[in-house]
Amino acid sequence: MQPDLLSRKTAALTLQKFHTLSPLTHCMTNDVVQTFTANTLLALGASPAMVIETEEASQFAAVASALLINVGTLTQARAHAMRAAVVHAKRVKTPWTLDPVAVGSLDYRRHFCTELLSLNPDAIRGNASEIMALAGVSNSGRGVDSTDVVANALPAAVMLAQETGAVVVVTGEVDYVTDGRRTVGVGGGDPLMTKVVGTGCALSAVVAACCALPGDRLLNVASACSWMKQAGERAIVRSQGPGTFVPYFLDALWQMTQEVEA
């Protein structure tokens, strides 16, 4: 039995709330996607901050609305800073999100992400291979690319949510979002989104920001997935390929926020 799909009306109402609150989102993310991630958050009305130095990162967790940990370009120094930020975020009750990039194919980051799971993230976002590897079900995956079908990863996502208390997002042609008890699907988007570096990482930042919103975290996080897929659908109408897709995608996010505020 397939999960119910999130309604776009729910996503629009959540976007109103998001734009009003403008979450200050601390992004400890990878070097490849920082600009695109920041621009995605700005287009939706959030406030991004890229603070990575250990002493500053732990301090900033006290003032941020939400924290993102993305291990895409992980180093020992960065792992130390991320660990310190998460510990402090937990202390001051700042919600944090884990993006376990390529966790299935590299031992160092898999061990690090497993360690972070003990600090109970509020959300986890990954592709099918990453979620299955993080749950200990499989070590497949080709770097950042998924080699598994999204539906096959759903049981692992449910198990991971039950074990950690996180809302877990498995992204693909249909995104599945689960808190271990309830699961919703988010359809839409366009295959070209997989040909642009950073769309998944940017989604993780939006998921992190949505964890700062009041109300139902499952629906808030699922709404983040919906906004990104809707923007992809709008962008593909005007773009001619990956190079023109990105500016149209950011424009679409911005236009969506203007529409819900009208």
Swiss-Prot record:
GO molecular function, one term: ATP binding
UniProt binding sites for substrate: M50, G198
Keywords, in A-Z order: ATP-binding, Kinase, Magnesium, Metal-binding, Nucleotide-binding, Thiamine biosynthesis, Transferase
Swiss-Prot/TrEMBL GO biological process terms: thiamine biosynthetic process; thiamine diphosphate biosynthetic process
EC number assigned by the record: 2.7.1.50
Regions that span the bilayer: none
Cofactor or coenzyme needed: Mg(2+)
Catalyzed reaction equations: 5-(2-hydroxyethyl)-4-methylthiazole + ATP = 4-methyl-5-(2-phosphooxyethyl)-thiazole + ADP + H(+)
InterPro entries noted in UniProt: Hyethyz_kinase (IPR000417), Ribokinase-like (IPR029056)
Top-level enzyme category: transferase
Pfam families: HK (PF02110)
SUPFAM superfamilies, alphabetized: Ribokinase-like (SSF53613)
Functional pathway: Cofactor biosynthesis; thiamine diphosphate biosynthesis; 4-methyl-5-(2-phosphoethyl)-thiazole from 5-(2-hydroxyethyl)-4-methylthiazole: step 1/1
Family of this protein: Belongs to the Thz kinase family.
General function of this protein: Catalyzes the phosphorylation of the hydroxyl group of 4-methyl-5-beta-hydroxyethylthiazole (THZ).
Protein's recorded name: Hydroxyethylthiazole kinase
Phylogenetic placement of the source organism: Bacteria, Pseudomonadati, Pseudomonadota, Gammaproteobacteria, Enterobacterales
